[in-house]
Regions:
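Active-site beta-loop-alpha junctions enriched in small/polar residues
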Residues: 9-13, 35-39, 66-70, 107-109, ...
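Acidic/histidine-rich catalytic cores of soluble enzymes
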Residues: 129-222
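Acidic (Asp/Glu)-rich catalytic clusters
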Residues: 21-28, 42-62, 88-98, 129-136, ...
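Hydrophobic faces of well-ordered beta-strands that scaffold small-molecule active sites
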Residues: 4-10, 32-34, 61-65, 102-104, ...
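Active-site acidic/histidine proton-transfer and metal-coordination neighborhood
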Residues: 72-172
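N-terminal pre-domain/capping segments
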Residues: 1-89, 275-277
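Charged helix-capping and loop-helix junction motifs
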Residues: 45-51, 80-87, 118-123, 155-159, ...
Length: 277
């Protein structure tokens, strides 16, 4: 079984960054994903301080890009240029603070066939590559599996994109996948099948990147994240499935409350594993 790094989505509130990361470490967390979903709250001046605090606490960072920063636009107009700029800026900040992955959403069908949408995403990621390489900040990106059954961003879509773009990895959101499968993620075999498909496209040594929480859904579409135990998604089969792979994993809780994040971590054994490694 590969090492599991586990932690919350979002930094805890604290007077200083050092205290925030110390609080994460005290709870046994060794990963954290913070977001620019509603705006860029971090600047280049503060990013090195964040990197130092995370490193001192042995917390691996990932970043969630703004929601509007998706690829696969129907044309290269204003919205595409804005998204490209936001992903570029996110990459600069991620590099400055030592984040290991930037998570982004895959976009929308916008009336196109799925194959054409995938082709547009891959093509526009080529534009992003050129821009980031020119600035020396081509960091790993992760494209997230989405939570609405008829929309773009199924696990199949994500795997095809990641297989064609070498700096992009799949991000498995098991809450989303549980919703779109009408609650099928109940046993280790189902989790392991998704992990095996992802393992086949990840480069050697790269960890699985996973989002996890309990989930409410209707008509195979996500409606909201739930406190752990209120829905039907459980961490035990994820733990057992991960044990079948040598590849390490980063698991981020997107639970709406701290107690749920702690409960999921206890099942995964993330806290005890971190202290014995």
């Amino acid at each position: 079984m590969g090492e599991i790094r586990y932690g919350p989505s979002g930094l805890p509130e604290a007077p200083t960054l050092e205290e925030a990361f110390a609080a994460l470490a005290a709870d046994g967390y060794r990963a954290c994903e913070f977001g620019f979903v509603s705006g860029f709250w971090l600047d280049y001046e503060a990013a090195p301080q964040l990197a130092e605090a995370a490193d001192a606490a042995d917390v691996a960072l990932s970043v969630h890009a703004p929601l509007a920063a998706f690829m696969g636009h129907a044309d290269r107009g204003k919205k595409f240029k804005m998204a490209l700029g936001m992903l570029d800026h996110t990459a600069g900040l991620a590099q400055a603070c030592g984040a290991r992955l930037i998570v982004f959403h895959p976009g929308f069908l916008l009336g196109r066939e799925r194959e054409q949408t995938i082709a547009d995403v891959v093509d526009q990621l080529g534009d992003l590559r050129e821009r980031l390489e020119a600035k020396g900040r081509l960091v790993p990106f992760g494209v997230e599996v989405m939570g609405r059954v008829r929309d773009f961003g199924t696990i199949e879509d994500v795997l095809v994109i990641a297989a064609q773009v070498d700096f992009v990895r799949p991000v498995l959101d098991f809450a989303h996948m549980h919703a779109t499968s009408d609650g099928a993620f109940l046993d280790a075999d189902t989790f392991a099948a998704a992990l095996a498909a992802t393992d086949a496209v990840l480069e050697p040594g790269a960890p699985f990147h996973i989002h996890f929480s309990d989930i409410q859904y209707a008509n195979r579409n996500e409606t909201k994240h739930l406190p752990y135990g209120e829905g039907t998604l459980r961490a035990e089969p994820l733990r057992d499935a991960l044990a079948r792979f040598e590849r390490p994993a980063t698991v981020i809780s997107e639970s709406p409350d701290a107690a749920s994040t702690q409960a999921i971590g206890a099942v995964l054994g993330a806290s005890s594993a971190s202290r014995s490694s």
